[in-house]
From Swiss-Prot:
SUPFAM superfamilies: P-loop containing nucleoside triphosphate hydrolases. GO terms for biological process: amino acid biosynthetic process; aromatic amino acid family biosynthetic process; chorismate biosynthetic process. The lineage of its organism: Bacteria, Bacillati, Bacillota, Bacillota incertae sedis, Caldicellulosiruptorales. It catalyses: shikimate + ATP = 3-phosphoshikimate + ADP + H(+). This is Shikimate kinase. Monomer.
Amino acid sequence: MKNIVLTGFMGSGKTTIGRLVAEKLNIDLVDTDSEIIKEFKLTIDQIFEIHGEKKFRECEKRVIERVSKLENVVISTGGGVVLDPENVNLLRKNGVIYFLYASPENILKRLKDDNTRPLLKNGDKLSNIIRLMNIRMPFYKNCDFEINTDILSPELAAEKIISIHMAKESKR
């Protein structure tokens, strides 16, 4: 089975839905942000603060190179992974990429008490969300499938991903 790759903006449900998909299919979940945290032995916030976004993205690329070679797993990526076309190509070689969409307003609601997101720290959170989403949306739109997490519970989103994936797999 091809990997199920989840991407989308922070707060779109990648980790939660990824966990549900992995549980239902009885396969492993690989969270690229967790892998980066293990490598640096720092939180994402600390990595950005100490090393900057450039070093974070370099490490993210190494992690993508490694996890994209795995088989039969769910891969939950960081929201900015799509900004590097090479990351997308690597993930697509052995996976199907699902973009988890959430509106800026819902992302704000989901992240309102979360102060660990380095790209949302300065200025108005909603403005930052909208600005970053506008930059990333063309990249997200290149994913294989879009799942709207505004209108689906995590459980229903997981079921929809599994349904799409199994239908796609049966045609291979």
